[in-house]
Amino acid sequence: MKDTLKLYFVCGTVDCSRKNILTVVEEALQAGITLFQFREKGFTALQGKEKIAMAKQLQILCKQYQVPFIIDDDIDLVELIDADGLHIGQNDLPVDEARRRLPDKIIGLSVSTMAEYQKSQLSVVDYIGIGPFNPTQSKADAKPAVGNRTTKAVREINQDIPIVAIGGITSDFVHDIIESGADGIAVISAISKANHIVDATRQLRYEVEKALVNRQKRSDVIK
């Protein structure tokens, strides 16, 4: 799971002002994202049959590139189209209920603080998304930025749980994020609003891979 979190692209139609979401996602897939989440929220978000139809089209794209397709906070849609997994927040469906309904799917959980981490049923989730790293405009209900604090604190007590950082992340922050113990980054605007999506995605993937290699080298020296 940790390798799958290297470059996690989160996107919905409201995040794509320059191009159609299908074009955006396909370009990101071509350029090296490792996981995709369909997060369809906002005032102009698709609903009902339109949302289902879009999810199916995005799922087909992800299958073509062998990238897992995750749906945000809509377990019924996950079940309906047999998506690869579900991502939920602290105030969404309880994770034990999600696992009961999706025994063989990927389940991710958002965590912001150590208090949230400590109260979460981590035994039934496959990864946690920690953030927001920086203040972000992509989520209207975003919590205060936590930087690397929570990631570092979690890694001190849990070396095994897969962690992805999210929230206002650009390539400038990748090194510090990986050094703090994250296994990858999740981005929205850094890809969806980029002038050149392929170039932006490749740069992010390059920075993540470089940071992971450097971290492993330091770990090997310490051993």
Curated annotation (Swiss-Prot):
4-amino-2-methyl-5-(diphosphooxymethyl)pyrimidine binds at residues 37-41, 72, 110, 139. 2-[(2R,5Z)-2-carboxy-4-methylthiazol-5(2H)-ylidene]ethyl phosphate binds at residues 136-138, 168, 188-189. Its EC number is 2.5.1.3. Transmembrane segments: none annotated. InterPro entries: Aldolase_TIM, ThiamineP_synth_sf, ThiamineP_synth_TenI, TMP_synthase. Its cofactor is Mg(2+). It is an enzyme of class 2 (transferase). The keyword Magnesium applies. Pfam families: TMP-TENI. GO terms for molecular function: magnesium ion binding; thiamine-phosphate diphosphorylase activity. Pathway: Cofactor biosynthesis; thiamine diphosphate biosynthesis; thiamine phosphate from 4-amino-2-methyl-5-diphosphomethylpyrimidine and 4-methyl-5-(2-phosphoethyl)-thiazole: step 1/1. It catalyses: 2-[(2R,5Z)-2-carboxy-4-methylthiazol-5(2H)-ylidene]ethyl phosphate + 4-amino-2-methyl-5-(diphosphooxymethyl)pyrimidine + 2 H(+) = thiamine phosphate + CO2 + diphosphate; 2-(2-carboxy-4-methylthiazol-5-yl)ethyl phosphate + 4-amino-2-methyl-5-(diphosphooxymethyl)pyrimidine + 2 H(+) = thiamine phosphate + CO2 + diphosphate; 4-methyl-5-(2-phosphooxyethyl)-thiazole + 4-amino-2-methyl-5-(diphosphooxymethyl)pyrimidine + H(+) = thiamine phosphate + diphosphate. Condenses 4-methyl-5-(beta-hydroxyethyl)thiazole monophosphate (THZ-P) and 2-methyl-4-amino-5-hydroxymethyl pyrimidine pyrophosphate (HMP-PP) to form thiamine monophosphate (TMP). This is Thiamine-phosphate synthase. It comes from Streptococcus agalactiae serotype III (strain NEM316).
